[in-house]
């Protein structure tokens, strides 16, 4: 089976600096796809850039943890604080899943109102990986709209949930440390037959990203990596085809996808990402009070 890879940059639309970083990475051949946040300050500019670069695959980065909702906050009270902004961090107890449905529909509609159509669906802070109920909502939306859903590293044992198209494998890692370049190279060399998604977060620092955060350094380091010719050159040298989510849209759902998400008896198994990403997820929930632990555990494929 041919080896193909989608390199997706998250957070398109977050800010002008992130937008510029993603476009520079795309022009350098370092990424093939991105995911758009429709409720963030850089959204209008990101839409213009998406029209300007039609070969860039742009999906919806469903956001429930940052900024203000697209819906009237009063209509989704379980998702917001008193000031109308999202509750930050992981999904809290007490969310009304009807509110999640409503906000996903509102974000989808804002995206399509621009004349663009999402090529895929994923979530900010990987909420559909960590929360089975959010996965259900997003899986139904992706299936009904005929777009792929980002593969989860957690096998949610669900019955009666449609199986949208998705990649065969996914690599969730960050590359903002001294060993990031070599780690990415090893990930590329280890790609197996089928379609794998690699996630990244390139971006230039700007006013929106000035708040002290471990992500600021990660974005700058990943920007340097994914705008270098090294990624495209490595893919060419090892015979891996860079593709985007439009290619996956045209493929029939794989047996792996159907078995994984239709089986009621499937065993729930969490496959850990590399340690830097896991640490950052925990820091987000704890308001980033702890420093980054750069220890690394062996990366494992999601299968």
Task: Spell out what each predicted region is.
Residues 1-6, 16-57, 68-116, 120, ...:
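Terminal accessory/targeting
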Residues 9-12:
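DG-centered beta-turn motif at the end of beta-strands
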Residues 61, 124-126, 201:
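Histidine-centered divalent metal-coordination motifs
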């Amino acid at each position: 089976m041919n080896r193909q890879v989608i390199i997706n940059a998250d957070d398109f639309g977050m800010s002008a600096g992130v937008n510029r970083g993603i476009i520079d990475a795309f022009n350098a051949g370092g990424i093939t796809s991105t995911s758009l946040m429709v409720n963030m300050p850089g959204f209008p500019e990101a839409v213009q850039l998406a029209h300007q670069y039609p070969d860039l695959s742009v999906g919806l980065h469903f956001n429930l943890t940052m900024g203000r909702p697209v819906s009237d906050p009063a209509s989704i009270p379980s998702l917001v604080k008193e000031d109308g902004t999202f509750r930050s961090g992981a999904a809290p107890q007490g969310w009304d899943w009807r509110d999640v449905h409503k906000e996903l529909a509102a974000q989808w509609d804002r995206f399509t109102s621009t004349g663009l159509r999402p090529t895929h669906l994923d979530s900010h802070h990987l909420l559909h990986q960590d929360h089975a109920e959010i996965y259900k909502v997003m899986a139904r939306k992706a299936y009904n709209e005929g777009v792929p859903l980002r593969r989860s590293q957690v096998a949610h044992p669900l019955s009666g949930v449609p199986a949208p198209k998705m990649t065969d494998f996914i690599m969730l890692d960050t590359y903002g440390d001294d060993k990031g370049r070599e780690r990415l190279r090893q990930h590329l060399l280890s790609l197996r037959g089928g379609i794998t998604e690699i996630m990244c977060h390139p971006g230039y620092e700007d006013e929106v990203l000035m708040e002290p955060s471990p992500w600021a350094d990660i974005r700058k380091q990943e920007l340097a990596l994914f705008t270098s010719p090294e990624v495209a050159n490595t893919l060419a040298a090892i015979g891996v085809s860079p593709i985007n989510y439009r290619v996956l849209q045209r493929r029939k759902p794989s047996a792996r996808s159907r078995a994984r998400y239709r089986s009621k008896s499937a065993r729930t198994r969490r496959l850990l990402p590399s340690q830097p990403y896991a640490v950052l997820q925990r820091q987000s929930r704890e308001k980033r009070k702890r420093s980054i632990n750069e220890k690394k555990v062996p990366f494992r494929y999601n299968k």
